């Protein structure tokens, strides 16, 4: 090897190795101080890219887990509000059951409806004011997407539904609304109610006054209706008619009449004080003149005593064919009922509803006048109309009864099948609560899965970018030794050119 001064190859070689060990020492110290194997892309370009993607996923999934917890909070907030709505609905149902009981007075129903209205208003208030972080969760139908992944499209949707009185089908819910008026309601709820029921018997039309029961013809100028005393037929003639049969007269009868012979025979066969019946009336033998049949008998008709005298029977006669009969009063037999009477004619009586029914009259509509207005009622009396519109009985704020038509009653009408309506509302609330409960469980599962994934990704990233302290400490020790050795050797290498000086001596 040539002996030169200008170039110290050994020194250069030693410096180069010293630089290498310096670089190794710097790298080891950097890794040990940061805890990372990859501190820059030059440490491991591919590993750095992989670890960076892991970091993105880990950070995204960690935030997704927080998002899922927010989703649980939203569901819990909504479900809590629905629970209170459910409580109000249960109370409304309880009150509705109470209202359907027939023992309630008008004031009872008003009190019940007042509380129901307050409960329904509270449901609307809860719906409008319940919110999570400024988002109203029950005031409208909405789909809220919760990001539960580190990438696009990785979401879980919470279906939020509008839950208020209207959406529950309880808008206008009422247990104390106007009820369809009946004729009975008009009579009991209003004063000075007048009117009549109509009846038809064949071609004949009649009216029956709803208050007095008087029967008249159904005409613009109605006539009073009577019952014919003889045949029971309806008539507008009130004159006396149906002449009665003059059975016992104050003038002596001709000999041998049926009545004279019958009574003479009773006297002949009896004794004074005996009684006997004739034509359904009891007679008493007052006197008996011998045993031929002559004598007197008496009876009481309509509270008055009547004496009949039998005479002109020849003493010792074998029969009573010569008997004559004379009465202290004229006595007649009614052709209507066959009873004894002092009247020679029977007067027609005013017709009654029972007389119409006896003549097979069929009830028609009724005309009822209330506060000057005339209403029409059907034959059953359970539907009252005015100008073709069904009428309802309502109450003013002061509790006074009033009549309103079907148009005015529509907005205030009692809810048909109120319990079924509330049960339907409860079912809807239950369905929404069930959905929210299920979504909470789903979020719990998603959070658990996200935690597992983050743990595994952290482990994977650690294996790529975290420093192995055993290895790095070993590398640092090696580099330190090489540094010390290199420094010592470099000092000796720098002295080598001085050997040339010995050649100059």
From Swiss-Prot:
Key words of the record: Bacterial flagellum, Secreted
Localisation: Secreted; Bacterial flagellum
SUPFAM superfamilies from the UniProt entry: Phase 1 flagellin
UniProt GO molecular function: structural molecule activity
Pfam families xref list: Flagellin_C, Flagellin_N, FliC-like_3rd
Cysteine-cysteine disulfides: none
One cellular component term from this protein's GO annotations in UniProt: bacterial-type flagellum
Database matches in InterPro entries: Flagellin, Flagellin_C, Flagellin_C_sub2, Flagellin_N
Record's miscellaneous remark: Individual Salmonella serotypes usually alternate between the production of 2 antigenic forms of flagella, termed phase 1 and phase 2, each specified by separate structural genes.
Chain's role: Flagellin is the subunit protein which polymerizes to form the filaments of bacterial flagella.
Family: Belongs to the bacterial flagellin family.
PANTHER family listed in its UniProt record: FLAGELLIN
Official protein name in the record: Flagellin
Provenance organism: Salmonella budapest
Taxonomic lineage: Bacteria, Pseudomonadati, Pseudomonadota, Gammaproteobacteria, Enterobacterales
